Amino acid sequence: MQLNPAEISELIKSRIEGLAGSSDIRNEGTVVSVTDGIVRVHGLSDVMQGEMLEFPAGKDGQPSFGLALNLERDSVGAVILGEYEHISEGDTVKCTGRILEVPVGPELIGRVVNALGQPIDGKGPINAKMTDVIEKVAPGVIARQSVDQPLQTGIKSIDSMVPVGRGQRELIIGDRQTGKTAVAIDAIINQKGQGVTCIYVAIGQKASSIKNVVRALEQAGAMEYTIVVAATASESAAMQYVSAYSGCTMGEYFRDRGEDALIVYDDLSKQAVAYRQVSLLLRRPPGREAFPGDVFYLHSRLLERAARVNADYVEAFTKGEVKGKTGSLTALPIIETQAGDVSAFVPTNVISITDGQIFLETSLFNAGIRPAINAGISVSRVGGAAQTKLVKGQSGGIRTDLAQYRELAAFAQFASDLDEATRKQLDRGARVTELLKQAQYSPLSTALMGASLFAVNKGYMDDIQVKQVLAFESGLHQFLKTSHGALIDKLNASKAMDKDSEAELNAAIAAFKKSFA
C-alpha cells in the first residue's frame, strides 16, 4: 500500500486538532508518611503556607483536602481535613493554588455546618453564591470606629455592670459547669428583632450538647438569624482548630457590608488544645504547658478580626453600594479554667487580648446565684460608652450595693451586734443579689430591666422578704406589660428615662406594691 505524504500530513493535522489537551499545570508531590492525620509530602516545590492540598478520593468519590502548615527544605507537613484512612504512602498530592475557603452569605443562616461550611443538619445542600478565605488580616486602625452602640444580652447582671458594645470582645471565663454556654445562648436569643446575625461556633463539644443548643435556639426562634458551626469532639484536631476561623469569616461577611454580627466561640481552650495536638504531631518545639510558641498569635489574630468598622471602610468594601453605615462583629469567646486558675497560659493570653471579662464562679453557681457572675472581678473596658442611658442611670447603685454587701457580709459572720446602717446595707445587698438571679433562656427587654433596677434602687423592695424578690419582679413585669404597655414601648424605643416616664414608673410600682401580698 502506497502512502501519499499529503494524506499523512492531513491525518496528523486532523489528529492534532481533535486532541483535547489540558493546559492545567499543577505542582505534584508524593506522600512519604501518614500518621494521626498528619501527612508528610515530598516534591511540592511551589506550595504556599496554609494552601489547600488535594489528596486522592475517599470512599464517597470526593477528593480529600489537607492544609499545608510546615514548609521544610525537602518536605511539606500537612494536616488532613476529615477522613484520612484511605491515604497511603506513595499517593499523589496536588497543589490547588488556593488558600482554604468556606462558603459565606445569608444562605447559611438557620443551618448547622461543619468547619468547612458543609451542611450537617440533613436539610439539603447550601447554595452559597460566595466563598471567602478563613485567614484574613484584621481591619487596620484607620478602618475602625469606637464602640458606642450597645449589644443587649438581656441578662441583668451583665447589662447593668459589665455592658457589652457592638464590636467589643468580651471574654466569658469560668470552670466547667458554671453556665458559660448558657450566658452566650441567652445573648443570642436576646438579639431577636435587633438586626444582629449570630454565629455560634462549637469547638470540641459532645454532639449531644450541640444538639441541645440547636434545639434551644430553635424553640426560642433564634435559628432564623443564627449560623451554627460545629466541630464535635469526634472530629479531627485540624477541624477543631480551623472551625473558629471559618465562623469568623462567616461573621465578617455581614460586618463588611454594614451589618452587625455576634460570634460566640465555645470554647477557645479546646481550640488551643487541638492546635497543640496538631503542632506536636508536626514536631514543632513545645513551650509552656507543651503549647507551641505561637499560641498567643493563634487567638490574637482571631479575636482582632472582631471590630466595629467605620462607614468609609464599608463603602470602600462594597464599592459604594452601602453608604453611611458602620459594621460590627462582636465576639464572646469562652475559656474554661481548671479549679478557678485564671493564671494558666491560655486564660491569661485571652484575658490580655479581650476588652473585658465576665467571671463565672463555681461557689456562686452552687449557692444558687445563677448566672454565677462575680461582679467584683468582672469588667468591661469599653462597654461603658455603649451602655443604654436607662440601664446606666440605674446600675451605678447596684454595683456599689453589691461591693459593700460582699465586704460587710464577710465581717458580719463574726460580729454579733450590728448597727442600723450596716444592717440596712446587708439587707439591701441580699435583695440586689436575689434580684440579679435570672432563669435560663429568659432574657429581659431594656425597659423591664430598667424597671427592675429602678424598683430596687428606689427602695421598693426593702421591706419585701428576700425569697419573695423574684416573685415581686415577675409580678411587676406582668403588671407593667398589661397596664402600662405604652410606657414600656416608650422606654424600649428611647432607651432613656425622662421625668414623665420616671413619675409614671414610680406611680406604677407603688400601685403594684399595694396589690402584692
UniProtKB/Swiss-Prot annotation:
Entry superkingdom: Bacteria
Record Gene3D superfamilies: 2.40.30.20, ATP synthase alpha/beta chain, C-terminal domain, P-loop containing nucleotide triphosphate hydrolases
Signal sequence coordinates: none
Xref: InterPro entries: ATP_synth_asu-like_sf, ATP_synth_asu_C, ATP_synth_asu_C_sf, ATP_synth_F1_a_nt-bd_dom, ATP_synth_F1_asu, ATPase_a/bsu_AS, ATPase_F1/V1/A1_a/bsu_N, ATPase_F1/V1/A1_a/bsu_N_sf
Cellular-component GO terms for this entry: plasma membrane; proton-transporting ATP synthase complex
SUPFAM superfamilies: C-terminal domain of alpha and beta subunits of F1 ATP synthase, N-terminal domain of alpha and beta subunits of F1 ATP synthase, P-loop containing nucleoside triphosphate hydrolases
Chief localisation class: membrane
Subcellular location: Cell inner membrane
Membrane topology: Peripheral membrane protein
Binding site for ATP: 174-181
Catalytic activity: ATP + H2O + 4 H(+)(in) = ADP + phosphate + 5 H(+)(out)
HAMAP family (alphabetical): ATP_synth_alpha_bact
PANTHER family with a match to the protein in the record: ATP SYNTHASE SUBUNIT ALPHA, MITOCHONDRIAL
Quaternary organization: F-type ATPases have 2 components, CF(1) - the catalytic core - and CF(0) - the membrane proton channel. CF(1) has five subunits: alpha(3), beta(3), gamma(1), delta(1), epsilon(1). CF(0) has three main subunits: a(1), b(2) and c(9-12). The alpha and beta chains form an alternating ring which encloses part of the gamma chain. CF(1) is attached to CF(0) by a central stalk formed by the gamma and epsilon chains, while a peripheral stalk is formed by the delta and b chains.
Function: Produces ATP from ADP in the presence of a proton gradient across the membrane. The alpha chain is a regulatory subunit.
Protein name stated in the entry: ATP synthase subunit alpha
Species the sequence originates in: Delftia acidovorans (strain DSM 14801 / SPH-1)
